[in-house]
């Protein structure tokens, strides 16, 4: 999921019950003094009653995004001649995920057929999104609790973070936003992907596609992943799926991490 929040709350109401709160919308507001800095909205997925000191009752809430609901349903289902946008819309809307948007920079052609075989809706969607080179995140509004699940296929769809000064001295409180730690890592990962599939409509179609990894940083080039069947029936899907699989396998070949205030 994009996030999971475990929240302890105090209330002067002693009468809150699971029936009143489970699956209700909840918003956590993060304040700096009297200024709200951020809002995170989700669905109450868990409820617990804790201490009662006579004047206040403590409760525990587990808050998850609406996408969490997709993990509670399992099905056997066939989608024919539908693209990833249509399949996603069907399953997300059926699970009550209404605040979402596709942000696609590439073509995602319709699939001849696509089978959900005993998977949860979330596992099925996650598999399809990975095959189509999609990632997802919650896009938060800057000044309101509004947020929207976003499906995206290119980093161009992410918001720019801007520029921040680097200040490794964490002993004193910085008055401005700054980065206090930055690290870079490189790892050996698979160097290429070769995939193949078959269609009875064109028995002699080779159906084989290959994608080489980029930025190998001196590693050996012998680490090939061969995937059969590649879960495609045409050239466009074959090329795209092979590329997306290569990008996924090397997604952490180079990684940067940081900390800020």
Placement of each model-derived feature along the sequence:
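Amphipathic alpha-helical and helix-coil boundary elements used as assembly
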Residues: 1-261
């Amino acid at each position: 999921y994009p996030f999971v929040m475990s929240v302890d709350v105090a209330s002067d109401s002693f009468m809150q019950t699971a029936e009143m709160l489970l699956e209700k919308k909840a918003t956590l507001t993060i304040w700096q003094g009297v200024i709200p800095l951020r809002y995170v909205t989700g669905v109450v997925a868990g409820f617990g009653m804790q201490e009662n000191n006579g004047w206040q009752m403590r409760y525990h809430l587990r808050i998850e995004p609406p996408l969490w609901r997709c993990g509670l349903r399992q099905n056997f289902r066939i989608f024919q001649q539908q693209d990833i946008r249509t399949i996603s819309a069907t399953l997300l809307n059926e699970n009550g995920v209404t605040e979402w948007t596709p942000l696609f920079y590439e073509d995602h052609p319709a699939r001849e057929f696509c089978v959900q075989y005993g998977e949860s809706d979330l596992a099925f969607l996650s598999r399809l999104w990975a095959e189509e080179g999609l990632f997802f995140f919650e896009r938060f509004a800057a000044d309101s609790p509004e947020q929207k699940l976003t499906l995206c296929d290119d980093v161009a769809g992410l918001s720019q973070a801007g520029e921040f000064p680097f200040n490794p001295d964490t002993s004193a409180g910085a008055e401005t936003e700054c980065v206090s730690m930055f690290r870079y890592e490189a790892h050996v990962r698979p160097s290429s992907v070769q995939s193949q599939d078959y269609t009875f409509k064109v028995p002699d179609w080779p159906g084989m596609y290959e994608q080489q990894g980029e930025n190998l940083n001196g590693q050996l080039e012998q680490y090939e992943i061969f995937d059969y069947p590649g879960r495609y029936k045409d050239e466009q899907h074959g090329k795209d799926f092979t590329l997306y699989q290569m990008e996924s396998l090397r997604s952490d070949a180079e990684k940067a991490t940081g900390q800020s205030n």
